[in-house]
Amino acid sequence: MMGRRERMEELDILAEAKRRFISVLQSRREAGGESIDLEEEVIVSGPLSSREALGQPCREDFPLLRGKEVLMQAVCSGAAGQAFTSDSGRFRGTLADVMQMPLNGSFERAVLIATMNASLRSLGLIEKTVHCKDEGPKRCASCMSEWIEEQDCERVGLIGMQPALLEALIQALGPDKVMISDLAEAGSVRFGVKVLDGMDCSEMFKSCQLILITGSTLANGTVDDLLLKARQHKRRVVFYGTTCAGASFLLGWERWCPCSD
C-alpha cells in the first residue's frame, strides 16, 4: 500500500501544492484568522526587465540576461511573489480565477506559483519571494561556498543553470565533485564541468549525495520526475531560489535562498 508521499508523487506536484494552498486559505478563514478572499485581485506582470529583476549584478551570464528565461511577478493583497519560467505573459483577475486555471503550460503554472508566493507572503507564512539584486547574487555565491562546506556530501548536483552558484560550488569542492544539468545549456562546458541534459540526469542521482534543484522545475513540470529519482536513490534534495518559496512551505521541502527579499 502506497504511503502519503508516494501517492503525492503519482500526482502533479504543483497541483498538490495548489490543493494545500486552498486548504490553508480555507482553514484560516474558518478559524477566524487572517486570510485572503478568493475575489482578491491578482496582477501578474511579466516579463520583468533585467533591471527590474536583477538590478545591476556584477556578472552578465545569468540565464535571464541571456534570454534563456523570464521572471514574472504577481502582486496579491499588497505582497509580491515571483516565478522564473520560459513562457511570458500578463494576467489580471481574481485569486479564484488563478485557482481555476488549468496547469497545462509553463505560463499558467508560473502564474499559479507567483500568486501562491505573493499570497502566502501577504499572510506572513513565507518570506524571501523577490529575487536578489545588484550585489545580492554575489553575496549568494559567497554564502553557498560557506554552506556547502558544512554539508556532509562527497559530490553535489546542481539542477538548473545558476552560474554564480555553480562557480561557487566548483571553487569550494573542485570540478570532480560537482555535476550540473540544464535544459537549455545541455552539452556545453561551464567552469570546466560538462552540463548534462536536464531531461536525463539519472547519473547525477546515482553519483551525488546532495541535489540542489531550481524552483523553475515547478514551472516547467520536471520537478515530479526529479523528486521520484531522489526518492529512489535516497538523496537529500534542497530547493533553491524564490520560485519555490510557497511550494516549499506547502510541501515541506528544504529550501536555500539566503539573499532574496
Annotate each predicted stretch with a short phrase:
Residues G215-L218:
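A short SAM/SAH-binding and catalytic strip from SAM-dependent methyltransferases
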Residues M2-P163, A168:
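Electropositive, gly/pro-rich neighborhoods at or near active sites that engage anionic ligands
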Residues P175-V189:
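NAD(P)-binding Rossmann-fold cofactor-contacting core
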Residues R155, D176-K177, R236:
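Residues at the starts of beta-strands that form the adenosine-phosphate
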Residues Q162, A184, T243:
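Residues in the short beta-alpha loop(s) of Rossmann-like NAD(P)-binding domains
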Residues V195-F205:
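Short acidic low-complexity segments
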Residues T222-D261:
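C-terminal functional extensions of proteins
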Residues C208:
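An anion/phosphate-binding loop that grips the pyrophosphate of nucleotide cofactors and donors
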